[in-house]
Amino acid sequence: MEKMTTLKSSENKGILTSTPIRGAGDGMETEEPPKSVEVTHGVQPINQHVLPSPRKKVSSDSPGVLQLGKILNERTVEVEAVRIFVPKAAITHDIPTKNTKVKSLGHHREELHNQAEVVTDPRKELSEVKKVLEKLKNSERRLLQDKEGLSNQLRVQTEINRELKKLLVASVGDDPQYHFERLAREKNQLILENEALGRNTAQLSEQLERMSIQCDVWRSKFLASRVMADELTNFRVVLQRQNRDAQSAIQDLLSEREQFRQEMTSTQKFLEELLVSLQWGREQTYSPNTQPHSTADLALTNHGLAQAIHAHLLGNVGISHQKKIPTTVEFCSTPAEKMAEKVLRILDPVACTESSPDNQFAESSPTTLLTTKKNIGRFHPYTRYENITFNCCNHCQGELIAL
């Protein structure tokens, strides 16, 4: 820490009282009272030197001025006093021990004796004082800069505190201006969000319109396909019905043909026995051959047997006698034949009309067809074929009536 002692010349106040001899044991003993001397760091002593006691206050009319005994008017220099404020953090305390105090005191005494012999130069002292003043001015300048920096920091901190106060007041809700600004910001944000939602809604409406158009297109396609499917279903139902009718007619024809074959077989046996019995005792002109393999062979065999019996019994009769026999015989179709003709007429009515214009017969009722055969394997004609039903079963007889 740098200290400065202000020297002030005064004609009336220039005498310092003599310093008493200190007692032994305090480390600052003096043999005789020396002359008053000012000791400063970096400044040469002026005039005679005196070591004052640190425990005794010096009486002075002006505080802050150290009286240094008798000072000559010729050698006095007036120095302006400048007060320096030093921060507490820059002060360091150095407490010397007892031995160091004694050594420094002895060394200081030798310096005082040597300096007393040297004659000081006023110009040199003036230059040194100027240097000290320059240093003090520099330190003052630095302190002013520090003060300015601290002032700026204080101003910034004050502004921050003001803003914090505003925020605190706004958070409490007592500031209507902040509330109005917040409402304005929220309104602007809501306007932007509303515009974005409006654009999204427009895009969604366009997509919805396109989707509705596509839905209409696919609905029309579906309806058209449904109509086509219904037509195909009806056509399939008709074809299935015709197929079942044709199958039933074929089965009926085959069953009738089987019955005719059995009857013709029995007729063949009867005719052969009759022909053999007629040739009894005579030369046999007929001998039984192998059994026929088809209905046509069976019919041909029966026809030959009938001719042989006819020739044996009646002989050779001329054509004139055959013409006398009435030939106006009207044949009727069997139920199976009628069913077959009906199926053919349904499948191709034009061809049936052209091929058999003279074959006109009354169609038999369904009751007649059902009574002639117990189960002809057909479906009921009035069903819709969702659930396939038969018009006959193994335990029932008669016609099924669709309600």
Swiss-Prot record:
GO terms for biological process: Golgi organization; Golgi to plasma membrane protein transport. The modification Phosphoserine is found at residues 53, 356. Changing residue 396 to A: Reduced interaction with GORASP2. The keyword Ubl conjugation applies. GO terms for molecular function: ubiquitin protein ligase binding. A motif (Tankyrase-binding motif) lies at residues 22-26. ADP-ribosylated by tankyrase TNKS and TNKS2. Poly-ADP-ribosylated protein is recognized by RNF146, followed by ubiquitination. Ubiquitinated by RNF146 when poly-ADP-ribosylated, leading to its degradation. GO terms for cellular component: Golgi apparatus; Golgi membrane; nucleus. It is found in: Golgi apparatus membrane. It comes from the Eukaryota. Residues 397-403 are annotated as: Essential for interaction with GORASP2. Keywords: ADP-ribosylation, Coiled coil, ER-Golgi transport, Golgi apparatus, Membrane, Phosphoprotein, Protein transport, Transport, Ubl conjugation. The tankyrase-binding motif (also named TBD) is required for interaction with tankyrase TNKS and TNKS2. Interacts with GORASP2. Interacts with the GTP-bound form of RAB2, but not with other Golgi Rab proteins. Identified in a complex with RAB2 and GORASP2. This is Golgin-45. The gene is Blzf1.
